[in-house]
């Protein structure tokens, strides 16, 4: 779904402005209006070329011809009176290419120490902080695992729902939802008339849901500190765009996983997408964490399938190998801090990678004194992992213009900062309770 605000002069298409109004300086808006006019068979703005020349310079004529070819070709292929939602999304991809041509090119590898931007890793790090602080906070009321709590919240917010709808909304498979439903039934927090009937909260579930919801609202206010309502709404709009593409990635990987093994291994990390998605996943805009969890869930599920298909490694094994390969050799303390997991889980995974001949170590005996680096085969898989991660992140963020992407990441950085502060406070409270 396209949620683009009406650009300057955009009211003209609705008959609310005259065609003689001056064209705004936003070249993307100018080209969007030009494409919409071509689709609708309306006169194009004669000032468009001049406005584009002021901002795009020598690329102005090329940009007009590219957009005209796209708009007229899409109209012939579709035949509808009004452009469909995917028309605007694909046009944004075309404009992103023009914008990239305007930017100064970077040659050579990224500077030393600069990690490639991979949104899955960024999401995981932030959500881990939110989850840990949430476990500490909600456990003081009643301990529930995160998925159980999310289902409780959803039933409290939306009323009775069948498990399939819950599974789609929270972004986890039906088997996990079934296990969670079983636990909540045993706790008598939810009920249903028969196996396929909608789930609903019991009186105890309503009471607990109300108490936990008050805590969730307080935590949400903390996580959205210094984020205005307008900024938050744009953040949610962007998440909806990203979620549509994350679901498309997941559907691609599911199809590949069900195909012949030879065909699976020969497929690229990301295939072309025709812009058509299945049922739209409706996000919960009442709290900032829920949409991020759903986005992360779909992106992680497709990532697990992709990395398994391309490397034979689990998602976490690929993560560990990636961290070891970024700036080898890596000492143990640095590795554990980057992974943000406990020593035992990190140790088991590193040991497994060493047994498979993908990681080697140097230094004194003992895990804590070692320095780890990828073997020759590990280095090859490291490149595969990073190229797949780069392509997946590029695919996910492709519909976003440079300024929209910058605003999204700036808001995301505020959430990261607030999540860190929230976790520090909850850890301090837990320490006081223990003493």
Where are these regions (language model features)?
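C-terminal peripheral helix-coil segments that are non-catalytic and often amphipathic
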Residues: 2-110, 268-271
């Amino acid at each position: 779904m396209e949620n683009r605000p009406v650009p300057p002069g955009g009211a003209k298409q609705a008959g609310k402005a005259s065609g003689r109004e001056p064209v705004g300086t936003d070249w993307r808006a100018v080209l969007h209006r030009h494409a919409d006019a071509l689709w609708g068979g309306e006169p194009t703005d004669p000032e468009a070329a001049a406005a584009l020349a002021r901002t795009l310079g020598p690329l102005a004529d090329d940009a007009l011809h590219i957009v005209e070819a796209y708009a007229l070709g899409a109209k012939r292929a579709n035949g509808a009176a009004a452009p469909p939602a995917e028309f605007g999304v694909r046009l944004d991809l075309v404009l992103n290419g023009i914008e990239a041509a305007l930017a100064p090119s970077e040659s050579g590898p990224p500077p030393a120490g600069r990690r490639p931007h991979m949104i899955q890793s960024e999401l995981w790090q932030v959500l881990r902080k939110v989850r840990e602080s949430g476990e500490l906070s909600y456990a003081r009321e009643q301990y529930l695992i995160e998925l159980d709590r999310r289902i409780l919240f959803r039933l409290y917010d939306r009323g009775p729902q069948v498990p399939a709808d819950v599974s789609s909304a929270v972004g986890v498979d039906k088997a996990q939802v079934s296990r969670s439903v079983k636990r909540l039934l045993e706790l008598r927090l939810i009920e249903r008339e028969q196996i396929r009937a909608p789930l609903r909260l019991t009186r105890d579930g309503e009471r607990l849901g109300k108490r936990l919801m008050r805590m969730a609202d307080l935590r949400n206010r903390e996580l959205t500190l210094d984020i205005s309502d307008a900024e938050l709404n744009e953040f949610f709009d962007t998440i909806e765009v990203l979620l549509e593409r994350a679901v498309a990635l997941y559907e691609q990987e599911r199809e590949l996983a069900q195909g012949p093994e030879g065909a699976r291994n020969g497929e690229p990390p990301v295939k072309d997408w025709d812009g058509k998605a299945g049922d739209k996943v409706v996000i919960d805009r009442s709290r900032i964490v829920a949409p991020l969890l759903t986005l992360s869930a779909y992106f992680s599920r497709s990532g697990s399938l992709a990395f398994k298909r391309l490397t034979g490694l689990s998602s976490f094994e690929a993560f560990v190998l990636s961290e070891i390969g970024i700036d080898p050799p890596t000492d143990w303390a640095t590795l554990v801090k980057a992974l943000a997991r406990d020593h035992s889980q990190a140790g088991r995974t590193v040991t497994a990678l060493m047994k498979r001949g993908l990681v080697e170590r140097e230094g004194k005996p003992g895990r804590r004194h070692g320095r780890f680096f990828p073997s020759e085969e590990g280095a090859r898989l490291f490149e595969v992992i990073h190229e797949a991660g780069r392509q997946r992140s590029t695919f996910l963020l492709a519909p976003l213009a440079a300024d929209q992407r910058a605003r999204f990441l700036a808001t995301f950085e505020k959430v990261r900062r607030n999540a860190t502060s929230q976790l520090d406070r909850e850890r301090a409270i837990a320490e006081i309770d223990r003493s």
